[in-house]
A protein has these predicted regions:
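Short acidic-hydrophobic, aromatic-tinged amphipathic segments that line or gate anion-handling sites
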Residues: 2-9, 69, 90
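N-terminal catalytic cores of NTP/NDP-binding nucleotidyl/phosphoryl-transfer enzymes
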Residues: 9-73
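Phosphate/ribose-recognition catalytic cores of enzymes acting on nucleotide-derived substrates
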Residues: 13, 197-307
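N-terminal Rossmann-like or analogous alpha/beta NTP/dinucleotide-binding catalytic cores
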Residues: 60-146
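Glycine-rich, Lys/Arg-enriched anion-binding loops that position phosphate/diphosphate groups
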Residues: 143-243
Length: 307
């Protein structure tokens, strides 16, 4: 899959670009049907399927105080899109200037840049452009004028409700990871860069990889059995999310740290993806670090029975 930053970077024939447009946070079941339709269009037209998406959530520019916690970081999102068979991604920098662009202007620029579009596929409730002045109706009007087809697909339903990134975030936040996984079509996973911690885990005999998960949706604090993926290699792990109340810290901050079973190496600066297998217990305050170490040993032994 090729990642481009402007339509002209992709040399394809006139009328061969089949576009899916959206933020696609989570690349959930609803997004997946949009991509399937886009890929089907490209195969029928001997064209290219192109996901048009943004480098950051629009709310982070338009209303930073209302930016949602993201289900994926950018690399996760792009990998998920690639896994579905999309040919190319147009990754647009969403900045203040772009946020002020009317929807019709955005679509006309795409059509000009790609040298005419064959089709655009979006969700039925998709909006775009300055002050959300664009919707499926505007796309259909522009499609008639510019010669492209429009698919406005109805949401995928699960248990009688529409699958959406908002609904999945709520499921993650409350710890309903089974529901989140069903809506995502895969196990919920957190990815972050391994950063330097305070080495308390190593002092207890259980070295951990501390992840930078700033801006990501996280499940409730607690201990989880997990799979930790480093590149193409997966390790069994125990994940802790919380404030580590047993450790003396007058100003605790949320930590996301993974102990990889039967593994010990310097991982600083590497990307690690954590798939949550099962919640083991709530976060607890212990009377001593010895009691904490004993409980961690029990957590590890229980986790081993789950893999």
């Amino acid at each position: 899959m090729k990642i481009i930053h402007q339509p002209a970077d992709l040399a394809i024939g006139r009328g061969k670009a089949c576009l899916a447009i959206g933020m696609f946070d989570g690349v959930h079941l609803g997004h997946q049907q949009v991509f399937r339709q886009t890929i089907e269009d490209s195969h029928r037209n001997e064209g290219r399927s192109v996901a048009v998406t943004f480098d950051r959530h629009p709310a982070s520019v338009i209303a930073p105080d209302r930016t949602p916690a993201m289900l994926q970081n950018r690399n996760q999102r792009l990998r998920a899109i690639e896994s579905l068979g999309i040919d190319d991604v147009l990754l647009i920098e969403f900045n203040t200037a772009f946020s002020r662009k009317p929807g019709a202007e955005f679509i006309r620029e795409l059509a000009d840049g790609f040298g005419m579009i064959h089709s655009i596929c979006v969700g039925a409730n998709f909006t775009f452009g300055h002050r959300r002045d664009g919707n499926v109706g505007l796309l259909r009007t522009l499609g008639q004028a510019l010669g492209f087809h429009v698919h406005g697909l109805q949401a995928v339903s699960l248990d009688g409700q529409a699958v959406s990134s908002t609904r999945i975030r709520a499921a993650v936040r409350t710890g309903d990871l089974d529901a989140a996984g069903q809506m995502l079509g895969r196990t919920f996973a957190i990815e972050g860069i391994v950063v330097e911690g305070d080495r308390h885990g190593r002092e207890l005999g259980f070295p951990t990889a501390n992840l930078d998960t700033n801006g990501l949706a996280l499940p409730p604090n607690g201990v989880y059995a997990a799979h930790a993926r480093l590149g193409q290699v997966t390790h069994r792990a125990v994940l802790n999310i919380g404030l580590r109340p047993t450790l003396a810290n007058p100003d605790p901050s949320l930590q996301v740290e993974a102990h990889l079973l039967d593994f010990d190496a310097d991982l600083y600066g590497q990307a690690m993806e954590i798939e949550l297998v099962e919640r083991l217990r709530d976060e607890q305050r212990f009377g001593s670090t010895d009691e904490l170490a004993t409980q961690i040993s029990r957590d590890i032994e229980r986790a081993r029975t789950l893999f």
